[in-house]
Amino acid sequence: MPPKIRTLAKTILKDPEEVKIAISRPPESIMQTAYICYDPQKLKILQDLFTQSRPQRVIIFSSSKMKVKELASTLKRLKFNVAAMHSDLEQSQREEVMKEFKSGHIDILVATDVVARGIDINDIKLVVNFDIPHDPEDYVHRIGRTARGTNGEGLAITFVSIDEQAQFKRIEDFLEKEVYKIPVSPEFGEVPLYEPEKYGMNKRGRGRPRKSEDKRSSSSPQKRNMGHRGRPKKV
């Protein structure tokens, strides 16, 4: 509770009781990674990842049903086995999509946060945050879906554009840890620096680019889990 709210409550309430709820944290067994990039680069990097290693049991989260529809449609055109889950679907349609996803007939599920809350599937190999959630706890709920398998391990990849850097920094502060930033391959062009204090949610601009082969957070122990060209070894 913010200090000002606590002070106000004490002035207007008589002997108030304060209940503290434990803050949820993702399992340590989840390897959390991020790409710092420009918004148009997100799809290109995602396509490259899926081309290098066939995606299986992947959930991609996007911020709105319109974006979910667009992303699913684009991935279908790229010949990926994908389905969309959003609020415009009838209940029977949602159930059919989930049935196909659980059975393995669909490799990739693109979904919004609200609709995806009812998804309870084990052995999700990868969670992709194509857009960053506004609430850090939504981030925890998202990536937690990839740690429900038999070994409790999982992989989460988050794409962070300039306008999302401040949001992502809040997530890192909430987690009390720095998420490993995967170096972007030079083939995708220059990428922005990770400067969340400069490029907040309401600050727009191209940002100061850097060459994508420059390494960031190179001291992270998670580097040993990365393949060549900075890609995760497994998808």
What residue ranges belong to the model's regions?
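Basic Arg/Gly/Lys-rich low-complexity intrinsically disordered segments
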Residues: 103, 174-235
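Conserved helicase RecA-like core
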Residues: 1-193
